[in-house]
């Protein structure tokens, strides 16, 4: 296992990890995120060409999401006390902890621990009370754990609070693409039985049985599902939250060359397929097609408020495990 640290501007750290087997990553202290990830010398996530673009992109490429991943209604109650979030422009919700103001856009502290079996990069940050309208303080730890003898890494989430009650729901926003122009020929499989019902602005209000065009309990090719969605769904893409039918949650994404298996103890999974051609410069390709990447974001189901409320004396914990295999 090898690693090196580069210092970018404003004390932002780039941490390069190589397990000397096939997996390489560049982590960034700003947003506690994954800037680059490669398997057998091929990129497996979308990486912006310039670090500066990564830092402040509104698409959250590879960053930690929080303090609340997903859309949380801007006004409501937490343990009987009112809260008032700063919403997205023209909306009645805050997304991923607040656009350009959340932990995704802050520089985290970090430390590195190495043993004979693994390398841990541990990021930490403490939020301020009422930051973005979110009540209370949260101490958050995000650990990227790389194994020396396997093409596998895990993300461990941990959080505590000195406040009476806070919201907490953490995830990661890597966009997967296994060095191809798009993901149309990829197969997706996952053990889910319900999907969120949303308002037109995608704020979750209920859940229902997974409809046929979103059923991935058996491996299904993404292009077939996306063709249907583009014709019949106003979103023109997959931007949905699924509830796992059993624990752990299991997701498999594969094409002809690479298989990615994800397991998690999170109760739900948000999937977002980037089906746009916004003018962004990427590192691996400059001619990506539509359907250029898929974000797989395990998280707690935001409609179940008890899952995302953390009290003083409690410890928030979740994990996501990523395993890569050549086909």
Q: Where are the model-predicted features located?
A:
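An exposed, glycine/acidic-rich loop-and-rim segment of catalytic or binding clefts
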Residues: 1-327
């Amino acid at each position: 296992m090898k690693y090196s640290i580069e210092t970018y501007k404003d004390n932002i750290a780039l941490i390069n990890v190589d397990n000397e087997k096939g997996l390489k990553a560049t982590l960034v202290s700003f947003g506690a995120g994954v800037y680059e990830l490669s398997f057998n010398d091929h990129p497996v996530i979308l990486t912006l060409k310039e670090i500066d673009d990564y830092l402040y992109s509104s698409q959250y490429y590879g960053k930690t999401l929080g303090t609340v991943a997903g859309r949380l209604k801007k006004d409501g109650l937490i343990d009987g006390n009112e809260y008032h979030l700063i919403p997205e422009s023209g909306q009645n919700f805050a997304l991923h902890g607040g656009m350009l103001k959340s932990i995704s856009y802050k520089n985290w502290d970090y430390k590195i621990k190495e043993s004979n079996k693994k390398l841990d990069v541990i990021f930490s940050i403490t939020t301020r009370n009422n930051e973005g309208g979110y009540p209370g303080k949260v101490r958050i730890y995000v650990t990227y754990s790389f194994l020396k003898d396997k093409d596998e890494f895990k993300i461990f989430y941990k959080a505590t609070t000195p406040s009476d009650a806070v919201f907490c729901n953490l995830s990661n926003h890597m966009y997967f693409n296994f060095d191809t122009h798009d993901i149309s020929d990829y197969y997706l499989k996952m053990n889910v039985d319900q999907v969120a019902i949303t308002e037109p602005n995608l704020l979750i209000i209920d859940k229902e049985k997974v409809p046929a065009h979103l059923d991935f309990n058996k491996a299904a090719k993404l292009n077939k599902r996306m063709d249907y969605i583009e014709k019949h769904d106003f979103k023109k893409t997959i931007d949905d939250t699924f509830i796992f039918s059993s624990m752990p949650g299991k997701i498999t994404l594969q094409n002809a060359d690479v298989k990615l298996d994800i397991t998690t103890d999170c109760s739900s999974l948000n999937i977002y397929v980037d089906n746009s051609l916004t003018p962004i410069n990427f590192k691996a390709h400059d001619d990506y097609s539509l359907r250029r990447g898929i974000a797989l974001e395990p998280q707690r189901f935001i409609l179940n408020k008890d899952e995302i409320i953390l009290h003083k004396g409690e410890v928030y914990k979740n994990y996501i495990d990523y395993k890569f295999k050549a086909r």
